[in-house]
Amino acid sequence: MPAGERLPGAPAREERIVVHVDMDCFYASCERRREPALRGAPVVVGMGYEPDQTVGAVATASYEAREYGVESAQAISAALERLPRKADAPDASAAGYYRPVDMAYYESVSESVSEILHGLGDPVREVSIDEAYLDVTDRTAWDVAAGFGRHIKQRIARSVGVPASVGIAPDMSTAKLASDHEKPDGLVVVPPESVQSFLAPLDVADLHGVGPVHARALRERGIETVGELADADPYVLEAAFGERGREFHRRARGADSRPVEPRGKPKSLSRESSFDGATESFDRVREQAAALSGAVADRASRTNASYRTIGVKVVTPPYDVQTRAESLPGPVDDPALLEAVSQSLLDEFEGAAVRKVGVRVSNLVFSEREQATLAGFSGDETGDGGGHEGGACGGAGRGSCGGQTTLDEFT
């Protein structure tokens, strides 16, 4: 939808529609995406469970694993006491599948989710690898917000293969509470007229920003629920907790006025696209990469960004992520060069089956002035001052991928 164009019936700007997307047990969901046989089984992602390891912790536990008392940040030894490894007890009915943390892979999946979200919301605020806010005020209306939320969930599930919980509300704090309300794979819509009734019965500790220490202090003052916090005297709260007390009161009333804003300037710009299954037609791969290069170049131009590095990402079956990049003598804004370098970087993958291809620029420089092209620098058109850098993340390289992309790249 063009900037500034509103959907017929969309609310006025002051009636915001904010979406919070939270990927359920994200690391475990990624492992199930890679190993579909793990669906429905207890999955624990962490380090320290191998026989030669003595120290480690749980990064993520699936909901099935949580039923056995396994929790995030728990010592791996405690997790193993509650839920032994299937590899150690193959015949046990109560055993789980333990997998090592593979950040490169999780970041790749997160990038795919990010690509979808940036196409559905404007603006988008990514707060972590598995969580984001979208302002969709101009994209939908309250009477069809539930359908819009289902569309987000379905796009992520079908295109990426991981589940998400979605909360929709007039403000960021309430939207986050809504996404937590029916996990996993939930969808909760809280329209403006329902905010107070939704918030009031919730435990005060559930309110966004209220940690265990403040929750205990509030309970000592007789405040147990969000509704009681909303009814409290804001001056008394401010006297007890400072400005944070005022903020607690605003959020308890559904009056969180924070705008959905991106976190600073991006470190990279990228676009990527998946094929139906895996394609062995490299002409299709090159054609898609050319289109992606054009989209990235357009985004760089619109944001007054020049770039020192051009890279590509290729995902081959089953879900092996490989990246290649070339550094340039200096920052440029040159669409023709971007396409030429990205096509050159793809050469080594000719003949491979490809599930997904992506193009990115990084090492960005932002300026209001006219950007340079490579002709403004000494050296030849291949960027001789740089060279290739990259890495592959396959089965043997899980958890340690030299040159692998990071979350700030390819987003």
UniProtKB/Swiss-Prot annotation:
Cellular component terms (Gene Ontology): cytoplasm
GO MF entries: damaged DNA binding; DNA-directed DNA polymerase activity; magnesium ion binding
Residues annotated as catalytic: 131
Basic and acidic residues bias spans: 253-274
Listed Pfam families: IMS (PF00817), IMS_C (PF11799), IMS_HHH (PF11798)
InterPro entries per UniProt: DNA/RNA_pol_sf, DNA_pol_Y-fam_lit_finger_sf, DNA_pol_Y-fam_little_finger, DNA_polymerase-Y, DNApol_IV, PolY_HhH_motif, Rev_trsase/Diguanyl_cyclase, UmuC
Keyword hit for GTP-binding: no
One biological process term in Gene Ontology: DNA-templated DNA replication
Binding site for Mg(2+): 22, 130
Family affiliation: Belongs to the DNA polymerase type-Y family.
Function according to Swiss-Prot or TrEMBL: Poorly processive, error-prone DNA polymerase involved in untargeted mutagenesis. Copies undamaged DNA at stalled replication forks, which arise in vivo from mismatched or misaligned primer ends. These misaligned primers can be extended by PolIV. Exhibits no 3'-5' exonuclease (proofreading) activity. May be involved in translesional synthesis.
Protein name per UniProt: DNA polymerase IV
